[in-house]
């Protein structure tokens, strides 16, 4: 029996009167004959380095327990986390929240793990991991990005048996030094690969959501390329009135807590003391989305997971983002007016950056070979010194180890980097040609 228009009106009023981030499941909404369904999502860079201080993260175990309690209390539909580097931390967290989030997945990659994982209240029917072809430099041991093996992880989540959500979570290479950004070609290539991955795997999905720490600010080329090429919307920007963020020259205008800063916030206890005097917080954590076969409407996107209630500690050195979406699956989504930045100029700029990285890789290769030759000369020269034989033996061993690394980096490491940059450049060029 079809419900009357009066009954539908009453049901609609009930839904509108419910508080923000209500805790009803999709199944309950369907039982109430409501066609528009709600989806609540949260993302956080959890900052959980398992190594001991000063390398590891401060208060890691306590903070992770509080994050788990927050997840249980808030009853989100999907949770995306980054920098959960230890698989044992993931297992411990999944056991803590399993009563509410019975479905979860950790994306394994690299030597230390990708740190990326997903928790869901609804069945995860399939997963796919795409490791970025460029992940920094092997000899930058003090950074660690190369050992982590950054990825974008896709989880296909099925809700009520008929709604397919493609949920992506990722963590791109860190910036470290904006004025002398050695990793900019790598991060730009990662941004292009992310956009390509979403673009090709999202076909057929009802809802598409991309979350994570992109390590790029809203005006950066890589972020603008992700939005334009994958046709995604920035949830925070759509929920808050902001000026045009596409001007690199006015970068500082878009920093600060009021502008959605998620990192280096002065109200965070883990922020460096030098950054607490001025609010120069950066917005580098994002919630991106687009409609698939269903119409998706953003209801709100807000900062969350800042300070732990009743404590002077924060959940992480970043803050999280939460969003609430309304999904209308009564009819197939119709294409909206193109509101994205033109794609071609961004691709042309990106190919220039990637080509610059390719040239730098060739130069570095020669540099490392020269260093290897210098090590060989020093080793041979030390053979003519008969004083301190033990000391020179140790020196020769150390020079041999360093020299072998220089040869490996020049012959293998930089060749792999150059080929990955070349592949990214050719992929971009192919799109430009078409």
UniProtKB/Swiss-Prot annotation:
The protein's name: Putative neutral sphingomyelinase
Group of enzyme by EC: hydrolase
General function of this protein: Catalyzes the hydrolysis of sphingomyelin producing a ceramide (N-acyl-sphingoid base) and a phosphocholine. C.elegans contain specific sphingoid bases, which are unique or different in structure compared to the sphingoid bases found in other animals. Two examples of these distinctive compounds are: 15-methylhexadecasphinganine and 15-methylhexadecasphing-4-enine.
Taxonomy, superkingdom: Eukaryota
Record field: transmembrane: 366-388, 392-414
Metabolic or biological pathway: Lipid metabolism; sphingolipid metabolism
UniProt cross-references to Pfam families, sorted A to Z: Exo_endo_phos (PF03372)
Family of the protein in this entry: Belongs to the neutral sphingomyelinase family.
InterPro entries, A to Z: Endo/exonu/phosph_ase_sf, Endo/exonuclease/phosphatase, Sph/SMPD2-like
Cellular localisation: Membrane
Main location: membrane
Disulfide bonds: none
Record field: catalytic activity: an N-(acyl)-sphingosylphosphocholine + H2O = an N-acyl-sphingoid base + phosphocholine + H(+); a sphingomyelin + H2O = phosphocholine + an N-acylsphing-4-enine + H(+); an N-acyl-15-methylhexadecasphing-4-enine-1-phosphocholine + H2O = an N-acyl-15-methylhexadecasphing-4-enine + phosphocholine + H(+)
BP term (GO), one: ceramide biosynthetic process
GO molecular function: metal ion binding; sphingomyelin phosphodiesterase activity
Record-linked PANTHER family: PHOSPHODIESTERASE, PUTATIVE-RELATED, SPHINGOMYELINASE FAMILY MEMBER
EC number of this enzyme: 3.1.4.12
Active site annotation, chain numbering: 318
